[in-house]
Structure formats: structure tokens, C-alpha cells
């Protein structure tokens, strides 16, 4: 070992050099080209130029630091290294040009690079005729970042990266391959060694409990075929089947179905029941099964639990072949503090807030994104665009929006920090959501976004230019809570809660609403929907049939969690399949048949969907019959005769000669009756059609089934 090495040499050997290109690789010294290479465990290294000339490099440090001159002065070269009895020709990663352009760095610096996924992460690349992988990661406060993986025996001294403007670290690793596992080895700002970090922009990851990122070649990801462009329009029917991929169905040994196995059965099932969309609970990589995906660590990676990115594309493609739109639950509000993830990524609060009064979610123990950082907002917006572009999904439903909007969300007095105006609104989160929606709709005008927002925040689904947040839809949590509270009560008490049904129409058109019967309503001791229904067995199923019919007749798009369509008895359990054996029982078959017919009617009748989000499309007919628990209303479409009369009887009594006024004289056909024997009901109804009693003041005399809802349309 030569004694008088420069400090930079020791920094390389000790794995703490922040800019290894300044010392390693080729360097002009006078008229000569000096090559320096650090190859731990190598006993001998030669530099071999493109003409075959060879020069032996001198070992100047026992750790594996070699120095010498290029044989012909300059040009391309390889390193021929001897490891024990094996000789290997290597391309020197420190002879290649930068990966990020000056324009990339400019956009990254101002937080407007809209395609982070094309630059950051791991990307196959050919430089100077050499194939390899380009690695880029943000770590502005790190002293040193190395990429470690299968290609270097996970040795952090082997491939230290160089830092570019704004704290982006990069390195091209020759001969690294798609399929290689990798992580980032980071030394923090105070010299502290951090846990190995997964790539925030990795396109794939190992199966938990392992946490390495996996190199994916984006060129191998075929683009799914698109869904019909009008599938998300406000005037189109939208009936969403919400699915947790790990528990919809399972194999006999309780193992998951893969993405490709799901592709063979799920789209056909959804099509058969008449749903227009599926919505997947988060598919992003996540370490904890019990989070259901809502605590993701890999926002750009579909979870490896069910297969590869190519396999997930096959599932999306299968849905699109059936003209089924695909929506993803998306979680930009918080992330877990697992040591391999985003938390304390570069030894500082890079993605989160440093102050726990701002940065930690009290309910979930997770960390909250710092929307005041341009890098964080750029990361999240790019992720949204990534799923819409690369996977051709049709929309994103944003989770837990209320927790993003309010600084005091679920916090005690004194446990939060006001905004600059002294208020509780998270101004940076508002700006982020507006930018997210603006960029999504600008680039994907046929896509949609939906907000799970549980407060009365105004204009969630109104355009940004009019002061709104810019979402396409908002979940109507108030409707869900009020109506479930009503229907779960014994009918004898419902007259005292008549307003819970009426109240929803006071605000039904203030937003573009989705009526959600989601996974959150069938867990944590709430019981299944059928489990909430009062009465004996027959009444429970009749109540549920009436409630579902009421939902499909109510203004707003529809969402139903898996299992609800056949009256799953148990609460949902993410660790096991739905109870498909229940479909051997007639009453459960009846619920499923009703959902199929409700979806069919909803899609077929413009009156039930065209004006879901427009007050012109709804008119109350009966609101004052609380004693008999009866409601009636008209749904309207754009055409003058596109009308549907809906009468709901939430009493177990049968009412004959019940008079209801209608807009047109003549015959009205009973197009659906939730009490039909086909669905398990008592078959009380109107024998298919009813004639108005008076031509001047048209009125129908109806038989109202017990705990039933009927739909009638005028005959042409």
C-alpha cells in the first residue's frame, strides 16, 4: 500500500465519498489518462483499451484500490479483474456520462417534472454501446448514497453514486439486469448509517417480508387496451364493484389467486352482475397484510403478492375486454414508518414533516406527507399519472381526503399547528389536491378521480377554476351513515327517523356523489350489511333487498363492496375468501339476482343515471307518510318521457290502493319489484302494469309490497 494517498482515496475506500466520479474512472493528467478503480476482493486489475492494448493497474490500497495509465492514452476501456481463480471483464461505471440532463435537473428543482418515473428509479439503458441499469434517487441531505444489489454482492463500497443538482444521486451500473434485486445504502447528514432503503420509484418489489426493489424493464410492459371513453361521464351509468384482491376468492389451501388467475374469473363475474367498474383496494406494495394496502411503501409497484407488473396488466386488460372500467384506491395522505420505506429516507424528514404535530397520523401511527415540499408533490402527482399512463387505469379514488384537508384531524386541542392564517385548513394539501386533479384531467380527460371525504368541505367535486378541489366525484358518506342507520332500525321506530331518508336530498346535488357501501362498513364490529338488518330471517333479507333497491333508485353513482351482492353473513376478513357457499341457499341467490337486475335496470333506463348529479333529474312525490314508512319519487332523464316512478315501503305491512300521482296518463309498467318471488320475496305487486285513474290528474292505485321497492315506467 502506498502511504501518501490523497484524502479522496481514503473516502472511496471507507465508502464515504459524495462524488466518486471526481476520483474514480478516467482522468486527464497532463497528456496522460489516469484510471482509478475500486474493486474490493480483486487481486489484480488490468485496463484494456478498445484496440486490445493492456496496462496493469497498481494496487495502491489493500482494500482494492487500483491506479494506472490507459495503454493508448484515451478512449474506451474495460477493466479485467482477477478474483481468486476467476478473471472477469468489467465496464467501469465511472467512465460514463451523466444520466440526468440539465433540463431534467431544472424541472426536478422546481418540482414540475411530470414524468419522474421515466428518470428516477431503475431503468435499463445503453450508454456508449454498453447495456446496464441507470439508478437515480432523491436524497438531498445524504453524505453518501450507494446502490447495492445482486450485481455487486450487496457491497455498498462497490457502487457509490454521484450527487447532482437538488440532491438527486445517480449511477449507471453496466451489466446490471432487469430482474436484479437492489436497494440504496445511505449515510445520513451526521454520518449515521441508515437502514437499507427500498427505491421509492421501484416498479416492482420482493414478496413480503423481504423488501428489496426489483428492476423492471418498462418496455416489456404491454399497454392495456383502453376502456370505452365515456365510461366515467357524469351522464353515464357508474356502478362500482369494490374488490380486495387477496380475499375475493382463494384456493382450497387458502392461498391467494394470482393476477392472471383473477383475470380468468373476476371480469366475467363483474360483467355478469352488470357492474360498470371494479375498484381495487390499494394494489401498491405494502408490508402489512392487515393494512389492506392502505399503508403503502411502494407507490409505483403493484404488490408482488399476486404476481408481476405484467400479470397485473393482464388483469386490467381482461377487465377492459369486458368493457369494465378499472379504478384504483390511491393513498397520497400518509405512509408507514417501516425502516426500509420513505420514513427518514436520507437521515432527515424528507417526505414527512419533522414535527410530529404535523407529520404523524394519530389514528394510524403513520407519517403524513409534507405537501409543502415541491419534491414530495412532484413525487405524488407523477405517481398518479404513472398508473393512468402505464397501466391505463380509468380513475383513482383518493383515500382519507378529510385527514389531508384538516391540520387538526383527529388531534386534541393543542396537538396541532395552525396554518399561516391561524386556521385549521392544510393549505399545502389543498394546493396539492388541486394540482393533482388539474394534471390528471389535462392529460387524461376521460379518466376520473373520486374523493373519500367525510366532512362538509365545500366544492370537492367542482372545477379548480371555480374554487373547487377538482375531483370528478365525492363519496357521499352522509347518505351512507343516515340511510344505514334508518334501515337498521325496527320498522316500528322508523317513522321517528323519517328525515334520515329525506335529508340526503337536501344536498344530493351539491357534489357529484357516489353512494358508497364500502369495505369500511363491514368490518371492526359493524357487522355485515345483512347482519344489521332487523327482524326475523325473512324480514332481514327483505330489508336488504329494499335498501339495495332504494340505493339504485337514489341519485348518485353506486359502489358496493364484494360480498354485499349476495348478502355475506360474516364481517369481511382479509385473510380468507368470501363465503361463496352461501350461494347454495335460495335467499342469497335472490339477493345476487336482485343486484344483477338492479344493475341492468340502472344501465338500461336513462332516468336512473343520466341526471344522477343534476337536481332536474329528481322530484319527490311522497315525503309525508312517515306513519306508513312510505316514500315515492320520480327519476328523470333528458328525454321528456324518460321517467321512472319509485315507491319504497319500509314497513312490513302491505298497502293496497295506495295513490301516487304521476306526470303522464296511461299505462305504467312495473319494471322491477324487490318483493318478487324471483328474489325471495312474497310476490306482492301490480301484475306487471297499472293504468292511471284520471287523465287530467294522472294518478296510480298501487299495491305496495312489504319491505319492498317498486320501479314503474310509462309505456310509450
Curated annotation (Swiss-Prot):
<dbReference type="GO" id="GO:0005978">
    <property type="term" value="P:glycogen biosynthetic process"/>
</dbReference>
<comment type="pathway">
    <text>Glycan biosynthesis; glycogen biosynthesis.</text>
</comment>
<dbReference type="InterPro" id="IPR006407">
    <property type="entry name" value="GlgB"/>
</dbReference>
<dbReference type="InterPro" id="IPR013783">
    <property type="entry name" value="Ig-like_fold"/>
</dbReference>
<keyword id="KW-0808">Transferase</keyword>
<dbReference type="GO" id="GO:0003844">
    <property type="term" value="F:1,4-alpha-glucan branching enzyme activity"/>
</dbReference>
<dbReference type="InterPro" id="IPR044143">
    <property type="entry name" value="GlgB_N_E_set_prok"/>
</dbReference>
<feature type="active site" description="Proton donor">
    <location>
        <position position="452"/>
    </location>
</feature>
<dbReference type="GO" id="GO:0004553">
    <property type="term" value="F:hydrolase activity, hydrolyzing O-glycosyl compounds"/>
</dbReference>
<comment type="similarity">
    <text>Belongs to the glycosyl hydrolase 13 family. GlgB subfamily.</text>
</comment>
<dbReference type="Pfam" id="PF00128">
    <property type="entry name" value="Alpha-amylase"/>
</dbReference>
<dbReference type="GO" id="GO:0005829">
    <property type="term" value="C:cytosol"/>
</dbReference>
<protein>
    <recommendedName>
        <fullName>1,4-alpha-glucan branching enzyme GlgB</fullName>
        <ecNumber>2.4.1.18</ecNumber>
    </recommendedName>
</protein>
<dbReference type="Pfam" id="PF02806">
    <property type="entry name" value="Alpha-amylase_C"/>
</dbReference>
<dbReference type="InterPro" id="IPR054169">
    <property type="entry name" value="GlgB_N"/>
</dbReference>
<comment type="function">
    <text>Catalyzes the formation of the alpha-1,6-glucosidic linkages in glycogen by scission of a 1,4-alpha-linked oligosaccharide from growing alpha-1,4-glucan chains and the subsequent attachment of the oligosaccharide to the alpha-1,6 position.</text>
</comment>
<dbReference type="InterPro" id="IPR006047">
    <property type="entry name" value="Glyco_hydro_13_cat_dom"/>
</dbReference>
<dbReference type="Pfam" id="PF22019">
    <property type="entry name" value="GlgB_N"/>
</dbReference>
<keyword id="KW-0328">Glycosyltransferase</keyword>
<keyword id="KW-0321">Glycogen metabolism</keyword>
<dbReference type="InterPro" id="IPR017853">
    <property type="entry name" value="Glycoside_hydrolase_SF"/>
</dbReference>
<dbReference type="InterPro" id="IPR004193">
    <property type="entry name" value="Glyco_hydro_13_N"/>
</dbReference>
<comment type="subunit">
    <text>Monomer.</text>
</comment>
<feature type="active site" description="Nucleophile">
    <location>
        <position position="399"/>
    </location>
</feature>
<dbReference type="InterPro" id="IPR013780">
    <property type="entry name" value="Glyco_hydro_b"/>
</dbReference>
<dbReference type="InterPro" id="IPR037439">
    <property type="entry name" value="Branching_enzy"/>
</dbReference>
<keyword id="KW-0119">Carbohydrate metabolism</keyword>
<dbReference type="InterPro" id="IPR006048">
    <property type="entry name" value="A-amylase/branching_C"/>
</dbReference>
<dbReference type="Pfam" id="PF02922">
    <property type="entry name" value="CBM_48"/>
</dbReference>
<dbReference type="GO" id="GO:0043169">
    <property type="term" value="F:cation binding"/>
</dbReference>
<dbReference type="InterPro" id="IPR014756">
    <property type="entry name" value="Ig_E-set"/>
</dbReference>
<keyword id="KW-0320">Glycogen biosynthesis</keyword>
Amino acid at each position: 500500500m502506498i502511504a501518501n494517498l490523497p484524502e479522496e482515496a481514503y473516502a472511496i475506500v471507507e465508502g464515504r465519498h459524495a462524488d466518486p466520479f471526481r476520483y474514480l474512472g478516467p482522468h486527464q493528467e497532463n497528456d496522460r489518462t489516469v484510471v482509478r478503480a475500486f474493486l474490493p476482493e480483486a487481486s489484480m486489475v488490468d485496463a484494456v483499451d478498445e484496440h486490445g492494448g493492456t496496462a496493469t493497474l497498481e494496487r495502491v490500497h489493500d482494500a482494492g484500490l487500483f491506479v494506472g495509465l490507459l495503454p493508448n492514452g484515451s478512449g474506451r476501456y474495460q477493466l479485467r479483474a482477477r478474483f481468486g481463480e476467476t478473471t472477469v471483464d468489467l465496464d467501469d461505471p465511472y467512465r460514463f456520462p451523466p444520466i440526468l440532463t440539465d433540463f431534467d435537473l431544472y424541472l426536478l428543482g422546481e418540482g414540475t417534472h411530470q414524468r419522474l418515473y421515466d428518470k428516477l428509479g431503475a431503468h435499463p439503458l445503453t450508454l456508449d454501446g454498453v447495456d446496464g441499469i441507470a439508478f437515480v434517487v432523491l436524497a438531498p441531505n445524504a453524505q453518501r448514497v450507494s446502490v447495492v444489489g445482486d450485481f455487486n454482492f450487496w457491497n455498498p463500497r462497490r457502487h457509490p453514486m454521484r450527487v447532482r443538482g437538488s440532491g438527486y444521486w445517480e449511477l449507471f451500473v453496466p451489466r446490471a439486469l432487469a430482474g436484479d434485486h437492489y436497494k440504496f445504502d445511505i449515510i445520513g447528514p451526521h454520518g449515521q448509517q441508515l437502514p437499507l432503503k427500498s427505491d421509492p420509484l421501484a416498479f416492482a418489489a420482493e414478496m413480503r417480508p423481504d423488501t428489496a426493489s426489483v428492476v423492471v424493464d418498462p418496455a416489456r410492459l404491454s399497454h392495456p387496451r383502453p376502456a370505452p371513453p365515456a365510461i366515467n361521464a357524469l351522464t353515464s351509468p357508474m356502478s362500482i364493484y369494490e374488490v380486495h384482491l387477496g380475499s375475493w376468492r382463494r384456493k382450497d389451501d387458502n392461498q391467494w389467486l394470482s393476477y392472471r388467475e383473477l383475470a380468468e374469473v373476476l371480469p366475467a363475474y363483474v360483467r355478469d352482475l352488470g357492474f360498470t367498474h371494479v375498484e381495487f383496494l390499494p394494489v401498491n406494495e405494502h408490508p402489512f397484510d392487515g393494512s389492506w394496502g392502505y399503508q403503502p411503501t411502494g407507490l409505483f409497484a403493484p404488490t408482488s403478492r399476486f404476481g408481476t407488473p405484467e400479470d397485473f396488466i393482464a388483469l386490467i386488460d381482461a377487465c377492459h375486454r369486458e368493457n369494465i372500467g378499472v379504478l384504483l384506491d390511491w393513498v397520497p395522505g400518509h405512509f408507514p414508518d417501516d425502516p426500509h420505506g420513505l420514513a427518514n429516507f436520507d437521515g432527515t424528514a424528507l417526505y414527512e414533516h419533522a414535527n410530529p404535530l404535523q407529520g404523524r397520523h394519530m389514528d394510524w401511527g403513520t407519517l403524513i406527507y409534507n405537501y409543502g415540499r415541491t419534491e414530495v408533490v412532484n413525487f405524488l402527482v407523477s405517481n398518479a399519472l404513472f398508473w393512468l399512463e402505464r397501466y391505463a387505469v380509468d380513475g383513482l379514488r383518493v383515500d382519507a381526503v378529510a385527514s389531508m384537508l384538516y391540520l387538526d384531524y383527529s388531534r386534541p386541542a393543542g396537538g396541532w399547528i395552525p396554518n399561516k392564517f391561524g386556521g385549521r385548513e392544510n393549505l399545502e394539501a389543498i394546493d396539492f389536491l388541486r394540482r393533482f386533479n388539474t394534471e390528471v384531467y389535462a392529460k387524461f380527460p376521460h379518466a376520473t378521480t373520486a374523493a373519500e371525504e367525510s366532512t362538509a368541505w365545500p366544492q370537492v367535486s367542482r372545477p379548480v377554476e371555480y374554487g373547487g378541489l377538482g375531483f370528478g366525484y365525492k363519496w357521499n358518506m352522509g347518505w351512507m351513515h343516515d340511510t344505514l342507520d334508518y334501515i337498521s332500525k325496527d320498522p316500528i321506530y322508523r317513522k321517528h327517523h323519517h328525515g334520515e331518508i329525506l335529508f340526503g336530498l337536501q344536498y344530493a346535488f351539491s357534489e357529484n356523489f357516489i353512494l358508497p357501501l364500502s369495505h369500511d362498513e363491514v368490518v371492526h364490529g359493524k357487522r355485515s350489511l345483512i347482519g344489521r338488518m332487523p327482524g326475523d330471517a325473512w324480514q332481514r333479507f327483505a330489508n336488504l333487498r329494499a335498501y339495495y333497491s332504494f340505493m339504485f333508485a337514489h341519485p348518485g353513482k353506486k359502489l358496493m363492496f364484494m360480498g354485499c351482492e349476495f348478502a355475506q353473513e360474516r364481517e369481511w376478513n382479509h385473510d380468507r375468501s368470501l363465503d361463496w357457499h352461501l350461494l347454495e341457499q335460495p335467499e342469497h341467490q335472490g339477493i345476487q339476482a336482485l343486484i344483477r337486475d338492479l344493475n341492468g335496470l340502472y344501465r338500461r333506463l336513462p332516468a336512473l343515471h343520466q341526471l344522477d348529479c343534476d337536481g332536474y333529474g329528481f322530484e319527490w312525490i311522497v315525503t309525508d307518510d312517515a306513519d306508513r314508512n312510505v316514500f315515492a319519487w320520480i327519476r328523470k332523464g333528458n328525454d321528456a318521457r324518460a321517467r321512472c316512478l319509485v315507491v319504497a315501503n319500509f314497513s312490513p305491512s302491505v298497502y293496497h290502493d295506495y295513490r301516487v300521482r304521476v306526470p303522464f296518463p296511461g299505462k305504467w309498467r312495473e319494471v322491477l319489484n324487490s318483493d318478487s318471488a324471483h328474489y325471495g320475496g312474497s310476490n306482492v305487486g301490480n301484475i306487471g302494469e297499472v293504468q292511471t285513474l284520471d287523465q287530467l290528474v294522472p294518478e296510480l292505485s298501487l299495491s305496495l309490497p312489504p319491505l319492498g321497492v317498486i320501479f314503474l315506467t310509462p309505456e310509450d
